[in-house]
């Protein structure tokens, strides 16, 4: 790898907070030792003058959201970034902007999860029913909720899946609680999961599963409980100690996540969106043992992932050698967006024709302590050694395009 990477140039744009949190300078130093030049990009200046660039790593989520609010400076930055991408299709972007936009919208990402679950037809996976509320709750809201397969209690989240406010959530137990809901938002069925959340941190074909505390169990059906408002970031911190996470007793089944299921979900999302750096929040239904994806995050914090920098550099090497499946989809993604009349720019779904594992064998489970709320469960490589059915692409594109055209 070292010989191949020598002389390559990797540009990155991250907020100063993200750089400090990740200690990204350590990654830059690791790259330099491998002969890779790392360039911190200044988007206020022409990117052309800062090139050439073989790969660009970014987290432009804040800038994209501000641009969507018509902030003139952010609009200019996003436009400059997009113009460089258009002028340099040979540059690998981690990750493509259309995919980031999908992950920034919980309604769209949940719909994608639903379509993937429908395609996979794996009984070990369930997609929690959800719906988007775009206006204040009225007399017909309860009917709509029932029509969409939701039942009390359910969890209410902001539609935007990024930023401080995105962690502010509520558990609604009855019709009275609907009065406090502030649209636009997304409501999602609450699934009892014995107060355990599994955060899956994905880097290309590698992933790490970290165990975190989560919400305790609640009785199914309508109750007279008052709505519970909470910050999910605080609840699921490694060191979190909250009455909301204090489990009276383990109910139903208590299972660890199935490695095969995690691998298949991660692979499906990579293929559907063409993304490399993302996080998946998974809970295990304590009645059925099914895995439920309750959130997806673009370029998460990777807390507890000790090998993040090594995985990232390995992935960069793989994409530059054309061995990472998601990267081969970028040009096809653009074509699909054009073919669907532009509306698919935020709903792109494309599949690989196959992928090659270059990372080696899967490593074993590592459980440091059953009482530790932040336990690293595993560090795995996604070994994809079989072709993916072309119908996967057709299924996702057709269903999402149909939904998009109906809105």
From Swiss-Prot:
Pfam families: Ins134_P3_kin, Ins134_P3_kin_N
GO MF term set: ATP binding; inositol-1,3,4,5-tetrakisphosphate 6-kinase activity; inositol-1,3,4-trisphosphate 5-kinase activity; inositol-1,3,4-trisphosphate 6-kinase activity; inositol-3,4,5,6-tetrakisphosphate 1-kinase activity; inositol-3,4,6-trisphosphate 1-kinase activity; isomerase activity; magnesium ion binding
Lineage: superkingdom: Eukaryota
Catalysed reactions listed for this entry: 1D-myo-inositol 3,4,5,6-tetrakisphosphate + ATP = 1D-myo-inositol 1,3,4,5,6-pentakisphosphate + ADP + H(+); 1D-myo-inositol 1,3,4-trisphosphate + ATP = 1D-myo-inositol 1,3,4,5-tetrakisphosphate + ADP + H(+); 1D-myo-inositol 1,3,4-trisphosphate + ATP = 1D-myo-inositol 1,3,4,6-tetrakisphosphate + ADP + H(+); 1D-myo-inositol 3,4,6-trisphosphate + ATP = 1D-myo-inositol 1,3,4,6-tetrakisphosphate + ADP + H(+)
UniProt KW tRNA processing keyword: no
Cofactor note: Binds 2 magnesium ions per subunit.
ATP-grasp domain location: 117-341
InterPro entries: ATP-grasp (IPR011761), Inositol_tetrakis-P_1-kinase (IPR008656), InsP(3)kin_ATP-grasp (IPR040464), ITPK1_N (IPR041429)
Cofactors that this protein relies on: Mg(2+)
PROSITE patterns membership: ATP_GRASP
Keyword annotations: ATP-binding, Isomerase, Kinase, Magnesium, Metal-binding, Nucleotide-binding, Transferase
E.C. number: 2.7.1.134, 2.7.1.159
Binding site for Mg(2+) 1: 281, 295
Binding residue positions for Mg(2+) 2: 295, 297
Binding annotation for 1D-myo-inositol 1,3,4-trisphosphate: 18, 167, 199, 297
Biological processes per GO annotation: inositol trisphosphate metabolic process; necroptotic process
Residues holding ATP: 106, 157, 188-199, 214, 232, 236
Similarity section: Belongs to the ITPK1 family.
Function of the protein: Kinase that can phosphorylate various inositol polyphosphate such as Ins(3,4,5,6)P4 or Ins(1,3,4)P3. Phosphorylates Ins(3,4,5,6)P4 at position 1 to form Ins(1,3,4,5,6)P5. This reaction is thought to have regulatory importance, since Ins(3,4,5,6)P4 is an inhibitor of plasma membrane Ca(2+)-activated Cl(-) channels, while Ins(1,3,4,5,6)P5 is not. Also phosphorylates Ins(1,3,4)P3 on O-5 and O-6 to form Ins(1,3,4,6)P4, an essential molecule in the hexakisphosphate (InsP6) pathway.
Record's subunit section: Monomer.
Name of this chain's protein: Inositol-tetrakisphosphate 1-kinase
């Amino acid at each position: 790898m070292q010989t191949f990477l020598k002389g390559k140039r990797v540009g990155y744009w991250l907020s100063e907070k993200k750089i400090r949190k990740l200690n990204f300078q350590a990654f830059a130093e690791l790259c330099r030792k491998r002969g890779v030049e790392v360039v911190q990009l200044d988007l206020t200046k022409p990117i052309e003058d800062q090139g050439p660039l073989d790969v660009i790593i970014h987290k432009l989520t804040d800038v994209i959201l501000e641009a969507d609010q018509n902030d003139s400076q952010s609009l200019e930055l996003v436009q400059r970034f997009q113009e460089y991408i258009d002028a340099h299709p040979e540059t690998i972007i981690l990750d493509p902007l259309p995919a980031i936009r999908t992950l920034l919208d919980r309604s769209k990402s949940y719909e994608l999860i639903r379509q993937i679950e429908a395609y996979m037809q794996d009984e070990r996976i369930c997609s929690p029913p959800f719906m988007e509320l775009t206006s204040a709750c009225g007399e017909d809201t309860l009917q709509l909720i029932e029509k969409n397969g939701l039942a009390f209690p359910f969890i209410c989240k902001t539609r935007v899946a990024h930023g401080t406010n995105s962690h502010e959530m509520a558990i609604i137990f009855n019709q009275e609680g609907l009065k406090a809901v502030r649209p636009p938002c997304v409501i999602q069925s609450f699934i009892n999961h014995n107060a355990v959340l599994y955060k899956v941190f994905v880097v290309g074909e590698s992933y790490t599963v970290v165990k975190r505390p989560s919400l305790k169990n609640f009785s199914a059906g309508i109750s007279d409980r008052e709505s519970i408002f909470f910050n999910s970031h605080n609840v699921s911190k490694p060191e979190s100690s909250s009455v909301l996470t204090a489990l009276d007793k383990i109910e139903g089944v208590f299972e660890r996540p199935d490695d095969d299921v995690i691998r298949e979900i991660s692979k499906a999302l990579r293929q559907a969106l063409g993304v490399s750096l993302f996080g998946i929040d998974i809970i295990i239904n304590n009645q059925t043992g099914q895995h439920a994806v309750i959130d997806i995050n673009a370029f998460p914090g990777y807390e507890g992932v000790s090998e993040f920098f090594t995985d990232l550099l390995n992935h960069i090497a793989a994409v530059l050698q054309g061995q990472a499946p998601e990267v081969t989809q970028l040009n096809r993604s653009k074509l699909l967006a054009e073919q669907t009349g532009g509306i698919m720019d935020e709903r792109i779904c494309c599949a690989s024709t196959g992928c090659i594992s270059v990372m080696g064998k899967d490593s074993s489970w590592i459980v440091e302590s059953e009482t530790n709320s932040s336990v690293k469960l595993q560090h795995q490589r996604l070994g994809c050694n079989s072709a993916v059915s072309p119908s996967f692409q057709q299924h996702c594109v057709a269903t999402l395009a149909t939904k998009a055209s109906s809105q």
